[in-house]
């Protein structure tokens, strides 16, 4: 599908991945998806995001599904639509850095089993953490979409993102995605940024946002006027709120204009009817709280904190019986973030900064207690931080420990063969070793049940 200079707008629907990850704790099953696939395949989407992110973990841990089998079945059910996944660079779909051989094999197997487009991101926008995944995507004939984690800070200027986009282009990416995971990108800022990206790079631009702060659809509209090529939306039963703006609304808003998506509204209505039932079940089962996921959270804008991180902080404070410290913690988050060199707040940095802010407030003294993860971040174990850290804080947290400046994965020896030996008794399929590499205990339990051992 070629990218035209302004029209029509191309749509990636997130209904099979980020929509339920954002609204219903990633609990949608393959059974929920399959009845809609035949019609989904006729709509004419640019792509369907259906795999990666938290779905892999959720399949194994909660749904007793093999994520690889889910992908193969979706591939068969959606023969005419590009399938897309979200990959965390060197973290793959786990929560730590993996060796290059594991990253390479994971990308190969994702593409072998039916993925067309791999959107890769890194929480710190450290391109060294994405290099291997992007090279592998290209080597195995996938489409490499590289994401910039969007955030606001004194260092995250338009110039910063333009330079990052140029580096991404030089790296061999096919598309550049602005990944606004917290819904912080405001409409006129989006317009200005996309105009600049269009002027300084030749690659198509994709916008991924959330409606957490109530500004998502406006941001998409301004992005469209600025010439964005593709936007992420979610079908209405799981659209809006903490998810993406609703597909049907964007399609209707652009109908009859030069940006007309050309998507069939009748078909969208049919599919939405099916997913309404799915959303109702997810609500009934307690995985989706409409009041929470659909209410506008303006605090996200005020404190630059993603919606998921807010609920996490509330959980930690309730556990500590310290809800009266909520606003003190919200005010501490930006201070910790500044001390740590302004990391974007997305997995895993959102958890690291949030937990440290809670400890600083509850401990009565800043950095009296420091988590292992905070120390790792300050030591460079997660990659290069966007700005210089507060050296006084670093000294207090890690003393004279050595700070690494090279790519963290350079320290990791090949791991694949070791993992293969460890799960010899289970291997029904080559992909099992990857499930085990990412989530050893969870995968072993799943494989034992599957193989009747």
Predicted regions and their residues:
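N-terminal amphipathic alpha-helix/helix-capping segment at the start of soluble metabolic enzymes
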Residues: 1-24, 76
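Hydrophobic faces of well-ordered beta-strands that scaffold small-molecule active sites
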Residues: 10-18, 46-50, 81-89, 116-119, ...
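Terminal or standalone catalytic/regulatory effector modules within metabolic enzymes
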Residues: 35, 41-59, 292-300, 304-453
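Active-site beta->alpha loop and helix N-cap motifs at the rims of alpha/beta catalytic domains
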Residues: 52-169, 173-176, 183-187
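Glycine-rich phosphate-binding active-site loops on the catalytic face of alpha/beta enzymes
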Residues: 120-123, 180, 226-243
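Catalytic cores of alpha/beta
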Residues: 156-168, 213-229
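Phosphate/diphosphate-binding loops
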Residues: 261-275
